[in-house]
Amino acid sequence: MADEGGLETGAHDELKGTEEQAVNFAPSPDFLWLCEQLFAKIDHVQFERANNLLTKPVTARYYEVISNFTTLWRTTVGNNIYPALRLILPYRDRRVFNIKDYTLIKAICAFLKLPKDSSTEKKLINWKQDAGRSVRLSKFCVEEIKKRRSEPQIDRNERITIDDLNGYLDQLAIERTEQGRSFKNLANSDIMNKCLTSMTFLEMQYFFDILLKNRPLGGHEHKLLNCWHPDAQDYLSVVSDLETVAKRLWDPSQRLGNQDLKINIGLAFAPQLATKLHVSYQKIGEKLGWDFFIEEKMDGERIQMHYTNFGSDIKFYSRRATDYTYLYGNNLKTGTLANFINLNKNVKDCVLDCEVVTFDSNNKIVLPFGMVKSSAKNMLSQDGIDTQGFHPLLMVFDVLYLNGATLVDLPYYKRREYLKQILTPTAHRIEIIKSIRANDEQMIKKSLEKALSVGSEGIILKRYDSRYVIASRSDDWIKIKPEYLEQFGENMDLVLMGRDPSKKDSLMLGLLDYEEVIQDSPIMVNSQSSEENSQRFRGFVSLCIIANGISNEEYKEIDRKTKGLWNDSEKIPPLEYMKFGSKVPRQWIDPKKSLILEIKARSLDNTRSSERKFAAGCTLFGGYCRQIREDKNWKTCYTLQEFERAKSGNNWRKRGSSKPQKVISKKRRYNIISSVNKALEDFAELEHRSDIFDGMYFYVLSDYFDGVKRKRIKKSEIQKVIVANGGQLVQNVITRNYNLNDLRIISSRNTVECNSLIVRGYDIISPKWVFDCLLSGKIMKLEPSHCFNFSKQLMDYAYKRIDQYGDPYERDINKYEWSSLTSEKICTTAKQQPDVQFDNSLMDVPHFLFHGRIVFLLSDNNNIQKESFMVDAYGGKVTNELSSANLVIVVGAVTQRRINDIRKQISSEVIKQDHPPRIPDMVSEGWLYDCIKQNTQVAEDNYRLP
């Protein structure tokens, strides 16, 4: 254990020295000055951008405004920017006002003395319906105030300064905590009235933003931090405290070292996170060196506890630096957790990494965190804590700082030893997460089986000798949890690309596509741009259409934020980076100016029609919108590469196909297409390989998606293959110096240009024909699989060349096709079945609500007739075999013992598989009723059982 205060004293002395120099030599500027010199100018740049008035690149203009402001502050005010930072970045400020839109609107209406339920009040409450995309609530409110009040005329010496406003806000935060959060208390606040009567309209606008914790700078926080000091952004991610950043980083010439970017006692930091890998247990074990700890994955909230001065000062911070100290206690005698902490008497300071879960003291079980979300809101007040039979339980798993010394560079096993030495658990209040040391695949399976049998989320594997890496997601920590049947993995943050307007708009969403760039220079560990530099933006590809799960309020919010940005489909979108399939929305929006929606799906739809409809090569089945992601933009949305990895890591089954099913083993399937991939590798270089395409001209319009391996072959790769085998490329079909009979137009996507050529009578060939020619070593006659869009006459000829199973009459099949045909199991009744694709739009019909659901109804009294009828009536199936179910619904009051028995049966499948399993979800009957009520399959998260 480190010496008490040894390292800490030096750190405080150093900080003290810097604090003495971070001072301002001039009086505090007016708040109006801050509004005019920074906020208003940033808004003006946004106005210039929206109206195409910029004479410089928009990023350069933003940096110009912000750099001028920071220079002006240094030269006219001083080196301490903390007073301004609290107002510029209010969402980073520690003060809590508890003011939401409705609270502020009602307080403003009271200030204006408007009658209750007046038209103006209703207009303000429903402001999103009338406000433009770039209009914030603050501006909307000020416009209404202007109509009823004249602007206050304030003498210069009576203006509110930045320091004055910070003082007022400090008092307001105390008032809102002690006197309550109602709008009446805010309306009656002397501070609120003082500000409203002493501010210009410009000041009011940004004052309202500060109260609402909005972003007056938009998304340009990093630009301000970089202009003030080159290390400010990195340092803020470590300490999460504006005051510390301002006091330490006042001189841009003084750079931080690696030691400075480590844990600071009392200041929140971004924790290390576990990675979820879609690989086998064998691969996971290899990554961890076959020496690791196995711990239960707790279903709670990540918390870091900062313990200082022998427990006289304790802080609790969430993963995102939210201060929950008022909730859990600030010393050993207060709160719902702090007063149960029992550390060694020699521990002066320490930082513990933990998870807070909810414990049911009546049934002695840990409750799923999703079940207590509503009660967690009540827990924000002291009266709501430790009631209704459950209370918070702190599960500790790591110690990162001890008596002045950081422990992050110590191996994990050593940190665990320290933790057990310094912390004495208190049953059901403060406990250490149990762990076992493991070194083989069987232990992973058994641990996961045991965790699932008691209703746990899963397990976490941690490398035995791993160090702790702040603000990272490391492969040294790997989480393993099952995927639920009828769900497609993790939630996805998708970008809005288009819509079909109607009574209930259908929104088209897509994925960000990029390609990896090989780095010539080494990547610095602390470089935030290293990941960005290794990826080159390619564009966006359409993935799905979503209409379920979006509330009327969210539709209004989407309309407001995208107002004026929609284009009708007659206007061609920027095809260089917007890729649609055959399904083109009636209106499209530039994804770079669009919104991000969080989507949950039941599974993938891999049918041939879906492959053509969407540029991603498939779509989502049962997609459901969870929320609008205000904290995300197009640069941080879900990528095509992440999507492909998620697909390859799971055996997602096809949906909606009524064609004869061809059952091909995974091994054979990869053998069949290996020669095509080999061809791509062999012809990747532009050296001459053959003369197969000699005398032929090719116009290539799109990439090609390999429907078997789920791999995309880029347009440029197809062109290289053609050139390497004697073909010539053309860039358009209008200007030509060749015979039209020698032209082959190649495409697998209904792009705008492709559709235009189809209308003009051109036949379009699939890229599959190119690769089949290479496999055969000669020009092949066209078969149906080669025809992307052909005239009826040519299609009739193509179908005459194959039998009912797709076997060609006029050419020899290669060994891969032979392997495919001999391994298929052909349905004998295939000829009588119509060749149709299931239309997923039918899922909107109530009778298909539970299509694909095979439900096991669990009840102690077998009184399940009503629920069984409801499942059947809405398109699902009820089964008595748990092994065939993809959903378990618990009906009525079922004993915990019976539920655990079912969980054990489900978890027993874990031991039989080499990958993390897919298991049926288990929900309460409330899920069934809410699905029918909302006419969509709602997310299961809030209905899971303890």
UniProtKB/Swiss-Prot annotation:
It is found in: Nucleus. Gene3D superfamilies: BRCT domain, DNA ligase, ATP-dependent, N-terminal domain, DNA ligase/mRNA capping enzyme, Nucleic acid-binding proteins. It catalyses: ATP + (deoxyribonucleotide)n-3'-hydroxyl + 5'-phospho-(deoxyribonucleotide)m = (deoxyribonucleotide)n+m + AMP + diphosphate. Keywords: ATP-binding, DNA damage, DNA recombination, DNA repair, Ligase, Magnesium, Metal-binding, Nucleotide-binding, Nucleus, Repeat. The active site is at K297. Mg(2+) 2 binds at E457. Its cofactor is Mg(2+). Transmembrane segments: none annotated. Its EC number is 6.5.1.1. One of its GO terms (biological process) is maintenance of rDNA. ATP binds at E295, K297, R302, E355, F397, E457, K462, K479, K481. Mg(2+) 1 binds at E355. Coiled coil: none annotated. The keyword Magnesium applies. GO terms for molecular function: ATP binding; DNA binding; DNA ligase (ATP) activity; metal ion binding. It comes from the Eukaryota. PANTHER family: DNA LIGASE 4 (PTHR45997:SF1). Belongs to the ATP-dependent DNA ligase family. DNA ligase involved in DNA non-homologous end joining (NHEJ); required for double-strand break (DSB) repair. NCBIfam families: dnl1. This is DNA ligase 4. It comes from Candida glabrata (strain ATCC 2001 / BCRC 20586 / JCM 3761 / NBRC 0622 / NRRL Y-65 / CBS 138) (Yeast).
